[in-house]
Design a protein with these regions (language model features):
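Active-site helix-to-loop segments that bind/position phosphate- or nucleotide-bearing substrates
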Residues: 1-183
Length: 183
């Protein structure tokens, strides 16, 4: 399993490295300058955390917000199906971690990425679209969050239909289902 995680990590690095060639278009930066690195899609990794969390770049803030919306949809679908969200197969099991939710999000991430990428390529941003926290993290202004939430309509029903299919498959293999059903 560790080898699979390593392959996934390398693939993600290559995937998001390709995003770095994409320019971002800005207006109003004469009055309110932005960091130089905001003119192109940056590294997926945050300089604050060394992970994808605590985004310091607008595109990462967009992705994090969109993934948060996806996580909510998948979590609702998992719980509604009567599955234990903490028992996953790819993401390691840790206290408080919803490993099954993260596992089931993986095949849906490309749809989120596509929506965000399409938005980034068509949108002209302004510095007011984002808010910098005292710690240096980049967050979405509420209006920008509304744009991202509108992208959610495209994926909202998908987690429920996929998890319904998984539940049917698990019912066909009762022993496997008993491993991941909530107690």
């Amino acid at each position: 399993m560790e080898a699979l995680r390593l392959i996934e990590g390398r693939a993600a690095l290559a995937y998001f490295t390709a995003w770095q060639a994409i320019p971002l278009w800005w207006k109003g930066i004469g009055k309110r300058p932005i960091p130089d690195e905001w003119h192109r899609v940056g590294l997926r990794q945050s300089s604050l955390s060394g992970t994808n969390r605590h985004a310091t770049h607008p595109v990462n803030a967009l992705l994090n917000y969109a993934y948060g919306l996806l996580e909510t949809e998948v979590r609702i679908a998992v719980v509604a199906a009567g599955l234990d969200p903490t028992i996953g197969y790819l993401h390691a099991r840790r206290p408080g971690r919803v490993a099954l939710v993260y596992d089931l999000m993986e095949p849906l991430r490309p749809r989120v990425d596509h929506g965000v990428l399409e938005f980034v390529q068509k949108h002209i941003f302004s510095p007011g679209d984002f808010v910098m926290t005292n710690s240096g993290a980049c967050r979405l202004h509420s209006q920008m969050a509304g744009f991202v939430a509108a992208l959610r309509a495209d994926i909202e029903k998908t987690p429920r239909s996929i998890i319904s299919l998984i539940t049917v498959l698990l019912d066909d293999h009762h022993n496997l289902r008993t491993l991941i059903v909530q107690h």
